[in-house]
């Protein structure tokens, strides 16, 4: 079993960092009249769905009545209509049912419109927990129906402590500098840190640090791609970088978008940055690498 699954927190006491969010959710649980719709906002892999599952359990939901929906692959109005129909039925296990909808920002406008009708008239035995990395893509009317909580990425120290703790539990012998490097390249994402740890423990100790640093090289290549797009480079150079990228196209899109957003917020007036953001504003779920390539080509051709 993968480490990130095996060591997924089962209780709020096991959550590292995000203490403010945990305390707020625990306070919500003490209320007599709970909200039936929640929105968790935070970067990919920071623990949103884990916190959602723990919260669902604390509400008194049976494990088999917690339903996770990946909005990245099921985002049409038909899915929303099916959802509206299924909530009418009482749960087979326990007295309540909780729907966790991950990547809600990837859903279509029609899905969100259909979901809104459900949120406006939710049965007493139904709860919704929506998770997103990009709240700007969620309809305001949907957001206002939810109690909103932010989940932050972990700092390097907390990631390192998590890795050390798990290595001790699993009796994994690994160099300290490797764990520190994993903490750096995982960029606050515990899931990513454990995925990398899973990979490196399978190889010879002398190669481990090199493998971890190769993950860092991928991020450097993404930065290189951004610079090429900003400096009107020729397509041949851009294509060369694109060919070497193995990262998920959607993650690359978000990295580019966040990088450009940071530049604009720092006060730089550059229409090219706005142009890049415009080409990368929509998700690449439907065609992946092909849409990434097309977006880059169109930017270079402008």
Specify the residue positions occupied by each region the protein language model found.
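P-loop/Walker A NTP-binding region and its immediately flanking N-terminal helices
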Residues: 1-148, 152-158, 164, 176-177, ...
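Amphipathic alpha-helical repeat elements characteristic of tetratricopeptide repeat
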Residues: 140, 157, 176, 215-223, ...
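Conserved GTPase G-domain signal focused on the G5
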Residues: 76, 190-191
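Conserved C-terminal helix/linker of AAA+ ATPases
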Residues: 197, 201-224, 270-274
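Short conserved motifs of the RecA-like P-loop NTPase core
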Residues: 162, 173-185, 207-211, 218-221
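Helix-rich C-terminal "collar"/helical-bundle subdomain used as an assembly and partner-interaction module
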Residues: 224-302
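C-terminal helical "lid" of AAA+/P-loop NTPase domains
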Residues: 99, 179-185, 191-205, 226-227, ...
